[in-house]
Amino acid sequence: MAQVQYYGTGRRKSSVARVRLVPGDGKIVINNRDWEDYIPFAALREVIKQPLVATETLGNYDVLVNVHGGGYTGQAGAIRHGVARALLQVAPEYRPALKSAGLLTRDPRMKERKKYGLKGARRAPQFSKR
């Protein structure tokens, strides 16, 4: 018998995470690696757990993630967004808790492009008065 799975897609900066929630004992696997090996920073692991803590479902679901693009912070944010969206499929009554914690909002902040004549997005070349 096929077991039920819940899907959610999360995005942050240039990262995209495809998240699957499967009823289980709380294992988190990212790109076929244990999440503690994949994300070396404890603070970012807390970010990933936020939706599960907000809905008091930590330890009820195994989280299986495919994520690509960006760095550690962007990927952690994308996973958080995907987990929150997948939890809505589990039970729509989680929406108020997730929304009040701000976990359903796609963070729109992106890297600003470099402009010609400047060294970066806003950094100008050194100015010499004389």
Curated annotation (Swiss-Prot):
<feature type="region of interest" description="Disordered">
    <location>
        <begin position="109"/>
        <end position="130"/>
    </location>
</feature>
<dbReference type="GO" id="GO:0003723">
    <property type="term" value="F:RNA binding"/>
</dbReference>
<dbReference type="GO" id="GO:0006412">
    <property type="term" value="P:translation"/>
</dbReference>
<comment type="similarity">
    <text>Belongs to the universal ribosomal protein uS9 family.</text>
</comment>
<keyword id="KW-0687">Ribonucleoprotein</keyword>
<dbReference type="InterPro" id="IPR020574">
    <property type="entry name" value="Ribosomal_uS9_CS"/>
</dbReference>
<feature type="compositionally biased region" description="Basic residues">
    <location>
        <begin position="111"/>
        <end position="130"/>
    </location>
</feature>
<keyword id="KW-0689">Ribosomal protein</keyword>
<dbReference type="GO" id="GO:0003735">
    <property type="term" value="F:structural constituent of ribosome"/>
</dbReference>
<dbReference type="Pfam" id="PF00380">
    <property type="entry name" value="Ribosomal_S9"/>
</dbReference>
<dbReference type="InterPro" id="IPR014721">
    <property type="entry name" value="Ribsml_uS5_D2-typ_fold_subgr"/>
</dbReference>
<dbReference type="InterPro" id="IPR000754">
    <property type="entry name" value="Ribosomal_uS9"/>
</dbReference>
<dbReference type="GO" id="GO:0022627">
    <property type="term" value="C:cytosolic small ribosomal subunit"/>
</dbReference>
<dbReference type="InterPro" id="IPR023035">
    <property type="entry name" value="Ribosomal_uS9_bac/plastid"/>
</dbReference>
<protein>
    <recommendedName>
        <fullName>Small ribosomal subunit protein uS9</fullName>
    </recommendedName>
</protein>
<dbReference type="InterPro" id="IPR020568">
    <property type="entry name" value="Ribosomal_Su5_D2-typ_SF"/>
</dbReference>
